């Protein structure tokens, strides 16, 4: 089972990496390289980056578990590769949970959300490459443009979600 809890703290939305990186990246990948069972599987999770998992003992030897920030998507990738999607679920753990927040770290890509984002992207791209997808310079160029458009579209949706739920939302900060 994969844990889930809402990412709302201090009257604003959290979960920036999932909202602003993973979900628009998956959308952009589908538009750029086409739909796949893997991308559909990843989209099926409300929050694919929650690190709380529980496993049956016999499952663990079948999983290659990474030691970087790509661990959550890596574990999901391994579950999708080795087991039927019907063998995993996502469970609401709490109404709220205060987890460790990372700094944005724009100037240092070895720290914080920059490092986390790089590790997550590498994990997803490697998984797709092992399935026979190739990523040329042109593919990455197209992916980048498609990702940016997808992220901007989602920001509009998040703005509406925040407004409907009485949460603060800073569009400039999100972009």
Language-model features, listed with the residues they occupy:
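Active-site donor/metal-binding and catalytic loop motifs
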Residues: 89-110
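Catalytic donor-sugar/metal-binding loop of nucleotide-sugar-dependent glycosyltransferases
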Residues: 67, 77-96
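Active-site phosphate/pyrophosphate-handling residues
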Residues: 20, 58, 74-78
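Aromatic-glycine-rich donor-binding/catalytic loop that engages nucleotide-sugar donors
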Residues: 28-69, 82
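Short beta-strand-to-loop element that shapes/binds the nucleotide-sugar donor at the catalytic cleft/hinge
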Residues: 1-16
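Terminal low-complexity segments of carbohydrate-biosynthetic enzymes
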Residues: 103-175
